Design a protein with these regions (language model features):
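Short, positively charged patches
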Residues: 1-129
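Glycine-biased, small-residue-rich flexible motifs in mid-sequence functional cores and linkers
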Residues: 81-307
Length: 307
């Protein structure tokens, strides 16, 4: 199955990653070979009990051509789940993996090094924001990559701290997982931050085509990628109503170690931190030194296993 076929199929009405994965499994299980695009259309119709008119197919081809051109002009790489260089971290999440992923910048962050998801609520206290920037810089200075979602609040603290690194050869980078297309940064307020990430050899990724706006469900999909692309997760500050809850759940599902900032968990906005620590689902971090020791230990163990 060629990448262009996958992209074109996904431009058809109501055809997404799950349908394409069903198609791929169907083809693999039957050991079907030498199929062309029209064969894939017929098989999708068989799988979904839908009939696509000629106009739908023609439109999907035009949309795919436009999408490929947009990516070429904006230096965006398209990963297919069948590519040899598709990130192993995403292969490991099985049917949760993106079928198509758009990436701009330093793609290697998805594939190498030790990644820490640095997350939390959009509403963050001034004190915790400063602590977040400091912790993130500490991690990157230790060669750890910071993965976050480019939202305001805790995400911004994570990215900003990463950009303050001493910039030696061993320094980590930062990767932003977007709920929107790479050329349509959301929130707009962080457009400058996204440019700085690229300038400092970081990376922007998204499942959305370059110029698309985010839908409600895209935020949850973004949260799963943050968890999948990281070896462990650090929650700076989060309420129980924050999207961070989704990332924590995906972290549990993917067997990721979770750390929570544990100071003043009785304060408003720290409810998720308190809950995860009390339930034994997260390790509490109460100081810079403790953060440094915990993350360096995780990093070293990761490299021992991978080598």
């Amino acid at each position: 199955m060629e990448k262009t076929d996958i992209i074109t199929l996904m431009q058809l009405p109501d055809v997404g990653s799950k349908t394409v994965l069903k198609l791929y499994n169907h083809v693999s299980n039957r050991r079907l070979i030498n199929l062309d695009f029209n064969d894939y259309i017929s098989l999708i119709e068989e799988i979904t009990n839908k009939k696509f008119m000629g106009i739908h197919i023609d439109k999907s081809k035009l949309k795919a051509e436009k999408l490929l051109e947009q990516c070429y002009l904006n230096k965006i790489k398209i990963f297919s789940f069948l590519d040899d260089d598709y990130p192993d971290r995403l292969k490991k999440i099985g049917n949760d993996k993106p079928v198509i992923l758009f990436s701009k910048g330093n793609h290697d962050i998805m594939k190498t090094g030790y990644n820490l998801a640095f997350i939390g609520s959009r509403k963050v206290s001034k004190e915790n924001y400063k602590i977040g920037v400091k912790f993130s810089k500490l991690a990157v200075d230790m060669g750890v990559n910071i993965v976050s979602g480019l939202a305001i609040g805790c995400d911004t603290a994570g990215h900003r701290g990463a950009l303050l690194t001493n910039k030696n050869l061993l320094s980590g980078k930062t990767l932003a997982v977007l709920p929107s297309g790479i050329q349509n940064i959301y929130p707009k307020k962080n457009t400058t931050l996204s440019n700085e990430i690229l300038e400092e050899e970081g990376c922007l990724i998204s499942e959305k085509p370059p110029f698309e706006s985010p839908e409600k469900y895209d935020y949850i999909m973004r949260d799963r990628l943050q968890a999948a692309l990281s070896e462990s997760i650090f929650i700076l500050q989060s309420s129980l109503g924050s999207g961070t809850v989704h990332t924590a759940k995906f972290g549990e599902k993917y067997s990721k170690k979770i750390f929570c900032y544990g100071i003043n968990t009785q304060n408003k906005g720290m409810e998720l931190n308190k809950k995860l620590i009390n339930e034994g689902k997260a390790f509490d971090i109460n100081s810079e030194e403790q953060f440094k020791l915990a993350i360096s230990k995780e990093r070293d163990e990761h490299y021992e296993i991978s080598h």
